[in-house]
Curated annotation (Swiss-Prot):
Protein's name according to its UniProt entry: Isoflavone reductase
EC number(s) recorded for this UniProt protein: 1.3.1.45
Pfam annotation, one family: NmrA
Residues where NADP(+) binds: 11-17, 36, 44, 148
PANTHER family noted in UniProt: ISOFLAVONE REDUCTASE (PTHR43349:SF53), PINORESINOL REDUCTASE-RELATED (PTHR43349)
Domain of life: Eukaryota
GO annotation, biological process: defense response; lignan biosynthetic process
A Gene Ontology molecular function term of the record: 2'-hydroxyisoflavone reductase activity
Catalytic activity: (3R)-vestitone + NADP(+) = 2'-hydroxyformononetin + NADPH + 2 H(+)
Keyword tags: NADP, Oxidoreductase, Plant defense
Gene that produces this protein: IFR
Active-site annotation: 144 (proton acceptor)
EC category: oxidoreductase
Length: 318
């Protein structure tokens, strides 16, 4: 019986990448990460303060102790990238929004290596082929869609992973700006609060990504993570929270017109976060029918995966 595929994670120390690494190790896949000989700059402004306390150095040491294979290399060194890719079967990219175009370097290296069974480009959000978002989010989605088209044109085997709303961005503050825990007095709700959204923890994204990587049925498909107990409206989530704290929050409903105005007037990261919230809570970009010829619903494809529900996730803040 053949062993499990060897998996390379690019961007392994990010908010999602680390969870993919840990899930790969747990699943028994030989796991590889690309690490730079010299540290890169980190002067960018993050969307939210990471809930993950580990430094990159601590993560790399943790990976090493877990049996992860560390490959020295650099995204800007084509030869080292090709060398890394030749050692594996599956390549998973978990780059942030500022590095989407850098995936062109990965695509070129995959083409030269000629051995990759599957490439997961950096998606991990809403479906970039099904959305009605506004800038600055739309610009990022269009970049990701362009990467999809290049992958397809080059004939590279792929899986696209659409996980919608991370709990770290959307749930730990009930999609409120400038706070890091759920509010206990008042809450702002975009639109009428009755549009379904899909929520998932970063750890569960890691688990489901590796499930898809080990699933031949996910080849050249888009995997959609819309877990049944986490497919909720913001009103339903607020009701769950109110029941936990035994208090009714003061609710202010914000019109789409006002949200769009706020997006234009806000600076980063608030304009980006508001555009994400607008996409899911007002435009309903997590509400659609899948095409079984090219899509998989994760909860149906991997029914044995136990996941953290929204209800369970909120317990830590009570």
């Amino acid at each position: 019986m053949a062993g499990k595929d060897r998996i390379l994670i690019l961007g392994p120390t990010g908010a999602i990448g680390r969870h993919i690494v840990w899930a790969s190790v747990k699943a028994g896949n030989p796991t590889f990460v690309l690490v730079r000989n010299t540290p890169g700059s980190n002067n960018r402004v993050n969307l939210v303060k990471a809930a993950n306390p580990e430094t990159k150095e601590e993560l790399i040491e943790s990976f090493k102790n877990s049996g992860v294979n560390l490959i020295q290399g650099d995204m800007n060194d084509h030869e080292s990238l090709v060398n890394a890719i030749k050692q594996v079967d599956v390549v998973i990219c978990a780059f942030g929004r500022l590095l989407i175009e850098d995936q062109l370097k990965i695509i070129a290296a995959i083409k030269e290596a000629g051995n990759v069974k599957r490439f997961f480009p950096s998606e991990f959000g809403l479906d970039v082929d099904r959305h009605d978002s506004v800038d600055p989010v739309r610009e990022v989605f269009e970049e990701k869609a362009r990467i999809r088209r290049i992958i397809e044109a080059e004939g590279i085997p792929y899986t696209y992973l659409c996980c919608h709303a991370f709990t770290g961005y959307f749930l730990r503050n009930l999609a409120q700006i400038d706070i890091t825990v759920p509010p206990r007095d008042k809450v702002f709700i975009l639109g009428d609060g009755n549009v379904k959204g899909a929520f998932v923890t970063e750890a569960d994204v890691g688990t489901l990504t590796i499930e898809a990587a080990n699933d031949p049925n996910a080849l050249n498909k888009t995997v959609h993570i819309r877990l049944p107990k986490n497919y909720l409206t913001i009103n339903e989530i607020i009701s769950l929270w109110e029941n936990k704290i035994g208090k009714t929050l003061e609710k202010t409903y914000v019109s789409e017109e006002k949200v769009l105005k706020d997006i234009k007037e806000a600076s980063f990261p608030n304009n980006y976060l508001l555009a994400l919230y607008h996409s899911q809570q007002i435009k309903g970009d997590a509400v659609y029918e899948i095409d079984t010829a090219k899509d998989l619903e994760a909860s149906e494809a991997y029914p044995n995966v136990e996941y953290t529900t929204v209800d369970e996730y909120l317990n830590q803040f009570v």
